[in-house]
């Protein structure tokens, strides 16, 4: 908040994808966003020693969490780059669901969840609704709403990045396992 910042893609031959979230803002105006001008050559050449405020981590430096498959977790690689472990009251997760994986029915009684599908395809359910999902989909799940995810691919994992808003850990989300995803659930 109140910190001038920018992102610059240094490559000339590939696109960069930036996924960001403004937590607690109802719209862009509510974030306090202010355009400060284009990124200049001087901005790019300025010496940097790191962030004075905030957290910057690389996903490869984060150990995968050990989630209990008996509680509906069939995620092969689940990492929490931002959480109460590094001082945040909201958790950011990075998850990979391998081909055929199902994140079984569950809910979070203490938080809302938002996730973005970076790659892969499958079926997602929330409340009484279900839909096909693929890269580019965002999914918002209010607190205490049953939801699940199924990777329908035989070859490609689903890669999702998301937030547990206002919960600094999975435990703080109020995670409740609700049971298996059935064949009936998968019919759209």
Regions found by a protein language model. Name each.
Residues 108-135, 174:
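A short beta-strand-loop-beta hairpin characteristic of the jelly-roll/cupin
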Residues 74-80, 93-108, 143:
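Conserved short histidine dyad/triad with adjacent acidic residue
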Residues 1-2, 128-144:
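Short acidic-glycine-tyrosine-enriched beta hairpin
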Residues 13-30, 140, 155-174:
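A short hydrophobic beta-strand segment most commonly corresponding to one strand
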Residues 29-90, 174-188:
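A short, N-terminal "cap"/entry segment at the start of jelly-roll beta-barrel domains
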Residues 1, 6, 16-40:
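Hydrophobic, ordered structural segments
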Residues 4-12, 104-106, 124-125, 141, ...:
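Short beta-strand His + acidic residue motifs that chelate non-heme Fe in jelly-roll/DSBH
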